[in-house]
């Protein structure tokens, strides 16, 4: 159980780092973290681009909105156990059943899906980010359901089934 907790902690820190970068980029771009102040400014910022390779003399432009969405989505991938950061969820079932039920029910794993849904006005301005959300969600859905079919331990079946259902929800957001 200790190894599972360590894995869950480390994988979620990867997601948290992406989420933190997304929040930082929102603050730098909009000057606020309040929904009521950010969403009205979306039309003014929608055309802004950043040259990611400018410091190296290259040229690769990406929309600021797309960068924000992708960083926020990395956070959602970690919290909602989407591929490739899904490895922690099945192992988290090693704990006591009440704790496992809390993790797999409506608490932690749905937070990432809720965040993507709550930021829908932002994600709607980035077709690239919407495609990434749909593809990752669909992949997670398929992988989770396929692995669930091969499991013999009921706790792992529930874990992979939860993974698949989270993939459905994430795909619907994309």
Where are these regions (language model features)?
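Hydrophobic transmembrane alpha-helices and their helix-loop junctions in integral membrane proteins
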Residues: 1-174
């Amino acid at each position: 159980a200790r190894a599972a907790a360590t894995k869950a902690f480390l994988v979620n820190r990867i997601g948290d780092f992406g989420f933190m970068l997304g929040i930082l980029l929102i603050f730098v771009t909009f000057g606020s973290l309040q929904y009521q102040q950010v969403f009205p400014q979306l039309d003014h910022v929608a055309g802004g681009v950043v040259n990611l390779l400018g410091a190296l003399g290259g040229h690769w432009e990406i929309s600021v909105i797309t960068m924000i969405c992708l960083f926020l989505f990395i956070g959602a991938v970690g919290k909602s156990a989407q591929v490739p950061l899904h490895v922690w969820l099945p192992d988290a079932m090693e704990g006591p059943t009440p704790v496992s039920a809390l993790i797999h029910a409506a608490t932690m794993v749905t937070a990432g899906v809720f965040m993507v849904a709550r930021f829908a006005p932002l994600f709607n301005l980035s077709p690239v980010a919407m495609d990434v959300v749909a593809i990752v969600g669909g992949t997670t859905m398929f992988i989770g359901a396929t692995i669930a079919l091969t499991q013999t331990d009921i706790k792992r079946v529930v874990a992979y089934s939860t993974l698949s259902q989270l993939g459905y929800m994430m795909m619907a957001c994309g």
